[in-house]
A protein has these predicted regions:
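Short, functionally important structural connectors and interaction interfaces within domains
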Residues: 44-47, 97, 125, 145
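Glycine-rich beta-alpha loop elements in corrinoid/cobalamin-binding modules
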Residues: 1-95
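A short, sequence-level motif marking secondary-structure junctions
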Residues: 96-102
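A generic structural signal for short, non-catalytic loop/turn and secondary-structure boundary residues
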Residues: 76-78, 98, 120-122
Length: 175
C-alpha cells in the first residue's frame, strides 16, 4: 500500500527491482495515493505497468482476495472489483468501484509479523471504526478526493476488535 506521496518513489522503486529480478511475480499496489489518481492511471499511466501489474483502488480487502483467487484460477481480471490493470496494451479499469461492508470484515490478524521489531516504546495496533469522513469540507484535507462515502463499523465490532487484539497480542495502545 502506498498511502502518502512520500512513499511513491520508494514503493515504485521496490516494484521495479522485484519485477526486474522476478518478472513472473504479479505486483499489485494499493493505497489512497493511487485511488486519487484513477483518472490519471486510466488516461496516461500505462508506463507504470512496465513494473506494476495492477493497482487496487478504493477499498481493498475483498478485491485483493478476489485477485489472488483469479491469479490462482482462470486469471480473469475482469472479475476483480476496484482493479486497474493493462491488457493487450490497454489500461482497463473495473468499475463501478465496490465499497466494503465494514461489519463483515474480521478482526485484523497480525500473526507472523515481527511486532517486537517496531520502533515504539509500547506495542500499538490499528483498529478501524470508520472509513471516509462525515464532513468532507476541510480545505487542507485530501480525504474527499478518495470519493469514499463515510461508513462506520458497529460499535460492538470495534469493541470486540479491541478485546481480541489486546488478548492475542498483549496490546493496550491502539490508533
Amino acid at each position: 500500500s502506498i498511502t502518502s506521496v512520500e512513499q511513491i518513489i520508494s514503493g515504485l522503486t521496490l516494484a521495479y527491482l522485484v519485477k526486474k529480478n522476478r518478472p513472473e511475480i504479479h505486483i499489485t499496489i494499493g493505497g489512497s495515493v493511487f485511488t486519487k489518481l484513477v483518472d490519471r492511471l486510466e488516461q496516461d499511466g500505462s508506463h507504470l505497468f512496465n513494473f506494476v501489474d495492477s493497482f487496487i483502488v478504493h477499498e481493498g480487502e475483498t478485491p485483493l482476495l478476489r485477485l489472488v483467487e483469479q491469479l490462482r484460477g482462470d486469471g480473469d481480471l475482469r472479475k476483480v472489483p476496484n482493479l486497474i490493470y493493462r491488457q493487450d496494451g490497454e489500461v482497463m479499469v473495473n468499475r463501478p468501484f465496490a465499497k466494503e461492508e465494514l461489519n463483515s470484515l474480521p478482526t485484523p490478524d497480525f500473526d507472523g509479523l515481527p511486532l517486537d521489531l517496531y520502533l515504539s516504546p509500547d506495542r500499538v495496533l490499528p483498529v478501524m471504526g470508520s472509513r471516509g469522513c462525515y464532513w468532507e469540507k476541510c480545505a487542507f484535507c485530501s480525504i474527499p478526493f478518495d470519493h469514499m462515502e463515510f461508513h462506520v463499523r458497529y460499535a460492538e465490532n470495534v469493541v470486540n476488535d479491541f478485546k481480541t487484539l489486546q488478548e492475542k497480542y498483549n496490546c493496550n495502545h491502539f490508533f
